[in-house]
């Protein structure tokens, strides 16, 4: 579940509560006391905790009863002071407005009281996770995402839990869900699409170097940061696979590669296929193999029945065609995506690529 929010970058400064004026959502979340161990066998989540970074608070508000919140978002390169390691409870946070709602719970804008740190707090109900049998998926998501550090991957700072809920402390992405932005505009121009593709390729290259396969890249799982940069946000279907060979069927139908539809083993190159589908959807407004029925969609995917509208440039068609190849080894590597002439000519990425520095180590 990625949170759904498309808002002005400065709008997250509003509607935080003081302890004396807790919101209804905050009062509900406070009902259950923190417990030091999970109460169900399946809730034994990751033992290691990542430390939460600190944002310096703004000057105090002159309005009685209101908490002033800085409107400045830190640079990815800013060296943030680390909070002391400690256990968190819901009482450590001011709870703001809801950012999104999903099958297993909700996401709220939140601020850690001691350090005034702005984040998104994802609240999941244990009963729902157990009912659907997805505890292992959440456990895997926490273990993987909490260890990734990349400007185009949403940070997971920490997690805690009480008797009924699990709370994930996530980086707040002020510009919200990319899918909502795509719906708003219908399709993106070449400049924006190429920028997103460079950012995505760099983030996926970082993941693949660490033997992490995402397996579910799509607009719904991407958020946008303060400067509009892409952030991979949902690692629910991701896997840490040192052998990089898997056989599990997962992901979204329109984005499934041929090898997964045919039940073959797959590796990190499934993400290359997804990147090609995503680039097409950015530029056209719909996935390339979209069809009235699942059967027809499957047929078009395994036959790579790729049709381009006339308004696409030769450069963009070349990139998409090199990613959407039936045989995984023939797909353009992620470094090739970042260095593709169409990407280099159109991308306006602000941050330098990370893959260059990781390769030199």
UniProtKB/Swiss-Prot annotation:
Family membership: Belongs to the protein kinase superfamily. Ser/Thr protein kinase family. Aurora subfamily.
Cofactor(s) annotated in UniProt: Mg(2+)
Function noted in UniProt: Serine/threonine-protein kinase component of the chromosomal passenger complex (CPC), a complex that acts as a key regulator of mitosis. The CPC complex has essential functions at the centromere in ensuring correct chromosome alignment and segregation and is required for chromatin-induced microtubule stabilization and spindle assembly. Involved in the bipolar attachment of spindle microtubules to kinetochores and is a key regulator for the onset of cytokinesis during mitosis. Required for central/midzone spindle assembly and cleavage furrow formation.
Keyword Transferase included in the entry's annotation: yes
Residue numbers binding ATP: 99-107, 122
PROSITE patterns to which the protein is assigned, alphabetical: PROTEIN_KINASE_ATP (PS00107), PROTEIN_KINASE_DOM (PS50011), PROTEIN_KINASE_ST (PS00108)
InterPro entries per UniProt: Aur-like, Kinase-like_dom_sf, Prot_kinase_dom, Protein_kinase_ATP_BS, Ser/Thr_kinase_AS
Name of protein: Aurora kinase B-A
Origin: domain of life: Eukaryota
Active site annotation, chain numbering: 216 (proton acceptor)
Signal peptide positions (record): none
Pfam family, any one: Pkinase
PTM (free text): Phosphorylated, stimulates kinase activity.
Source organism (scientific name): Xenopus laevis
Biological processes per GO annotation: cellular response to UV; cleavage furrow formation; midbody abscission; mitotic cytokinesis checkpoint signaling; mitotic spindle midzone assembly; mitotic spindle organization; negative regulation of B cell apoptotic process; negative regulation of cytokinesis
Cellular location(s): Nucleus; Chromosome
Gene Ontology terms for molecular function: ATP binding; histone H3S10 kinase activity; metal ion binding; protein serine kinase activity; protein serine/threonine kinase activity
Classification via SUPFAM superfamilies: Protein kinase-like (PK-like)
